[in-house]
């Protein structure tokens, strides 16, 4: 929502600049230096800077013909193999990257792990059973996660919330079993889709 407001503010500022000096064809930032008078003051006074709390991310683009073998070896170091076992017992192997979230990874691969609260620790619909060899490699659950797990049906000693599992190289080969049922509260029969 903050990003949309920042974009709207930027568009409005650009429109105001165009009204100041429509003849000027130089960079909009230079138009302020060339134009004078009350019109400039009104345009600048009406502008509000976007929030500094706006979160951004940096993406890295790679070409498809990356032929450097050391890059391929480096990329392989960051691959984590995970197997989801769905409610019918079907095994779904997935290759993931270090740092991936188990809940979002399931959504990306069409696995029916609900996550109704979008990883905000407000439900237990992303409840999974972690394979015994990998459960001890996970960090201890926080108190909030334990509180949500207390509401999960069919709780076991190896139960965790998928939204709180971040993949590390030590978790390579981990198996995550989806419980037969989850508990979510629906209003008027509405069943939300995974996000």
Swiss-Prot record:
SUPFAM superfamilies, sorted: 2Fe-2S ferredoxin-like
Protein name per Swiss-Prot or TrEMBL: Ferredoxin-2, mitochondrial
Entry's family note: Belongs to the adrenodoxin/putidaredoxin family.
Cofactor note: Binds 1 [2Fe-2S] cluster.
Pfam families: Fer2
Coiled-coil zones: none
Binding site for [2Fe-2S] cluster: 117, 123, 126, 163
Residues of the transit peptide: 1-61
Organism annotation: Danio rerio
GO molecular function, one term: metal ion binding
Domain 2Fe-2S ferredoxin-type: 81-182
Compartment(s): Mitochondrion; Mitochondrion matrix
InterPro entries: 2Fe-2S_ferredoxin-like_sf, 2Fe-2S_ferredoxin-type, Adrenodoxin-like, Adrenodoxin_Fe-S_BS, Beta-grasp_dom_sf
Subunit structure: Component of the mitochondrial core iron-sulfur cluster (ISC) complex composed of NFS1, LYRM4, NDUFAB1, ISCU, FXN, and FDX2; this complex is a heterohexamer containing two copies of each monomer. Form a heterodimer complex with NFS1.
Function field: Electron donor, of the core iron-sulfur cluster (ISC) assembly complex, that acts to reduce the persulfide into sulfide during [2Fe-2S] clusters assembly on the scaffolding protein ISCU. The core iron-sulfur cluster (ISC) assembly complex is involved in the de novo synthesis of a [2Fe-2S] cluster, the first step of the mitochondrial iron-sulfur protein biogenesis. This process is initiated by the cysteine desulfurase complex (NFS1:LYRM4:NDUFAB1) that produces persulfide which is delivered on the scaffold protein ISCU in a FXN-dependent manner.
């Amino acid at each position: 929502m903050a990003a949309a407001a920042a974009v709207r503010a930027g568009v409005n500022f650009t429109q105001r600049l165009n009204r100041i000096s429509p003849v000027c064809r130089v960079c909009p930032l230079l138009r302020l230096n060339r134009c004078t008078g009350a019109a400039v003051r009104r345009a600048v006074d009406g502008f509000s800077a976007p929030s500094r709390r706006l979160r951004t991310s940096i993406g890295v683009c790679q070409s498809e013909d990356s032929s450097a073998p050391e890059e391929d070896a480096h990329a392989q170091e960051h691959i984590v193999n995970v197997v989801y076992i769905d409610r019918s017992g079907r095994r779904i192997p997935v290759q993931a990257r270090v740092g991936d979230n188990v809940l979002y990874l399931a959504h990306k691969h069409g696995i029916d792990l609900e996550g109704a609260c979008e990883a905000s620790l407000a439900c237990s619909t992303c409840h999974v059973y972690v394979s015994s060899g990998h459960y001890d490699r996970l960090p201890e659950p926080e108190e909030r996660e334990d509180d949500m797990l207390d509401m999960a049906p069919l709780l076991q000693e190896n139960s965790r919330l998928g939204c709180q599992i971040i993949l590390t190289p030590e978790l390579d080969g981990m198996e995550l079993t989806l419980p037969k049922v989850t508990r979510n509260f629906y209003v008027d029969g509405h069943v939300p889709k995974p996000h």
